[in-house]
Amino acid sequence: VNKMKYADLHIHSSYSDGSKRPEEIIDSAIKNNIKCISITDHDSIASQYVTKNNYDDLLIIPGIELSTEYNNMELHILGYFIDVENNDLKSLVNELNIQRIKRVESILYNLRKYNINLELKDLEVDNDSTVGRSHIANAMVKKGYFDNYKSAFRSFLVQGKPGYVKGFRLNYRDCIDVINNSGGVPILAHPGQIYRKLEVENILKELKCFGLKGVEVYHPSHTQGDVNKFYNLSKKYKLCVTGGSDYHG
């Protein structure tokens, strides 16, 4: 996105469902003249301990992406400038990790009914990384059940397919509170992906009342029409504007 040419505030590393380690992401950002990044792993702050070093040519903002529940919808909330030593944030992340493992175990149980026999130990997960469907799909390929990741994921792991188990979601108000209380800035991620797009303005109004500070206006999934709409809504409700690539490697 041109307006975010020198910053990328939405990146996933191998500590969640990205393929690159934080060190590789940092090297790539510096080589590509990016001046500011935030690694926003799903439900994880582990990468933040790796990126604490100071770099002359790169500002790294501590970040996270949380999956939340709002009126039976999934909303993703980004948190920037979080204090990774905050006890409430640590407790939240720990609970999310426990729930992720439970979900993965349920998915593996479902897959065994179709003679796809995988165990937790078969999933290649870095220490302190969050485990998820991407790790299962990779294991399905490695064990020879599928030829490629996309086929494995789409055949068994998306909603409506036999391996799917709904993910655990936190209440959106709790997530916004924890981000704010940890010194962070809560941002609504990729609003263009909300399946009831007509409700976005009402969602923004309500979330602002509970402490939302901004909107991810610039995202690869957004059309120019989306960008214009969300930019204008951000200005209308005095919310900050952010953007990022949602890079996974």
Regions found by a protein language model. Name each.
Residues V1-E74, F156-V158, P162, N171-V178, ...:
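An N-terminally biased module of ancient metal coordination in phosphate/nucleic-acid-related enzymes
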Residues N53-N202:
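Extended substrate/RNA-proximal surfaces in nucleic-acid metabolism proteins
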